[in-house]
Amino acid sequence: MLANYIKIAFRNLQKNKGFTAINIIGLAVGMVSSILIFLWVYNQLSYDRIYKKTDQLCVVGVKGTLDGITRVYFSTPKPFGPAASEEFPEIANISRLEFSKNFLMTVDDKKLKPGYGAFVDQSFIDMFDLPLLSGDKTNILNSPSEIVLTEQLAKSIFGSTDVVGKVIRIDSTEMLSVSGVLKNIPSNSRFRNHSYFLPWKFLERIGWSDAN
């Protein structure tokens, strides 16, 4: 019985090839659209939900108006960290963040501009539970002469992730020692485009953090 139904269905499809093609194309487009919508919704619902301490984290932005346009900026003014900790004792930990410029990095005769990076406090890695391939989470980003790389950037510069202790020249003026290598950051994290992190102490040393 089932075989007869299948034969009849095929005959009808062959008799109405144009109509059949339209239906098949419509079905395919509908299925692809449904899958894409599902993936988009999943990405939105999982965005920044990958951290173990998600329910304890709060990202603070600074609202400003320029030329009549109001925006929210996520760079942190220098005094904010100490002031917030003093004003709100319930804050267990805090890290400031300032986006870096596109530094020129040099190792031997290799030079590259890796793109996005950020200056952060020492507590940053632990707060967001970013997984380390190498390095001591309790001690990295403590010195102004350190840098933490992602796995991808470490491989691009050194060809390996076993690079703790190796030195990178920044903009031909600063020598920084690699203190840790992070696993590549997932695409559903706000830090997905960051390929390195620098200590806030380094930012203070070079004088970028005078905003108040």
Regions found by a protein language model. Name each.
Residues 11-12, 20, 40, 76, ...:
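Membrane-interface anchoring determinants
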Residues 16-45:
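Short, strongly hydrophobic transmembrane alpha-helices
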